[in-house]
């Protein structure tokens, strides 16, 4: 996981562990160097970060902060230079990408009925993510209701209904082509009669230029009045996740993200870009196809897999 980003940051080469140098894009970083020696490194590092799917503004921040930390450390640190570099990377990403966490399970426990609306483009794993979160809530004793409000895509209602059957949760559905907002309304109304309930609203995958579907999404929000709106994003989309986040945030207001297919992403840079640029939390990441393959995200989790 994140092999490409590890390579670009120069922390994947074990043979350098005791050499005193760390390689970044063919440039040997000696952390005992003075500030003049970091100019070439800064340029190479920025290019390397861009190749690892880190957005340009974020790459600028990381390279500037990281190289300053290395320069500061070079004055006083001796020993394992690779460890010094890794610690500088850890401190830099914390500084650039730290966002206050959002615990959806804790938030849901404070209301008798909690409503979550899911949005995202086709192919990002939205429906599967809903099923995974439904299983998580069910396992914690919540009464879970899924609203099959994706009434446009062929087979979408059947797909979410099958998930509900496998998990053992209620699915509210209407006929194909029906009013998505009406489905969400019925689901919220049904759940409101049960204490400790959670409503998970599926919506149609919105293409970025489909204004009609975006308006329908706004209508669902008005009708269901969700406590939380989550955007599902595919880690393999790279820096395009930023344009998707901007689109949906402008349309309905996003509270956080579920990032899917993280297990298949060798680059890993989109996570840093997303946190740094939007300042909104990643709640969960998808690490596989089973219902249990949903991991609560934390920056520590990310850094441990990147640096260890």
Kindly give the residue locations of the regions a language model identified:
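Non-catalytic terminal/linker segments enriched in charged/polar, low-complexity residues
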Residues: 1-117, 139-145, 166
